Every structure is written in structure tokens, then in C-alpha cells.
Amino acid sequence: MSAADIATKRIYEPAAAPDGHRVLIMRLWPRGIRKERVDTWLKELGPIPTLLRDFLDERVTWAQYVPRYLAGLERPEAQAAIAEVRRRAREGRVTLLCGCADEQRCHRSLLRAYLLDSPRARPRSPRARAPRGPARRRRA
């Protein structure tokens, strides 16, 4: 999976062909958005309601929000949703959608980075093999 396979976009921006498979990653359905504008809704990838409320009410800073959101991605239901996004990304481009206006301080950018930086996203490298041929003994 490469950076080109996963994009992010605000749900209120018009859909476009390059978006590929559009995945909404909010716990609540956004107002005014028709279901036809989204291919898949994975609410398990949205921040838990208490974390989002604390962040919006400024009881939690962005620096505190980030590790708490990422920790939430380790929940089994979130991991199942992440597996779905990875599967879709192997088939073609995926666009992660959210209602946040500021992409830099939004969970969609955190999720994209998580998907791209996670060991499961990296191509598997060939295993190191032992040298072939007769074994060499070390001299004492």
C-alpha cells in the first residue's frame, strides 16, 4: 500500500472520480449528506464520543488527543475496520472522509498516517537466509 492508495477529503467537498472508494470515518452521520455520496461507513474508525467531545470543548489538547485516538485504533472492532480499508486499498484508491474543516487536526489524517506507517502496510521483505555451503568453524 502506497501513499497514492489512500487519500483524505472533507465529506462536504464534491465527490470526484479520483476519490475511488469513499469511506466515511465518523461515528455520527453528517448532516445534509446523502448516502449515495459514501461507499462505506466505518464508524468504528471515528474517535470515541467522549474523546471528540473533550477535544471540541478544549478540555483535551491536540497533543493529548493524538495518542488517545491512536490507542482507540487498537480495539478489535477498529482493527476489523482497518482490515477492510486495507483490503479496499489493495483493490484501488480509497478516500477517507470526515466533516472536520482542518485536515491537519483531524483524525482522518491520523488514520491515513497509521495505515501507511503500520508494519502491516509495508511490503514484506524477503527473509534473510543463512549462507549456503559448508559451515565454517571459528578458530579458537
PLM region spans:
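Residues lining hydrophobic/aromatic ligand-binding pockets adjacent to catalytic sites
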Residues: M1-A140
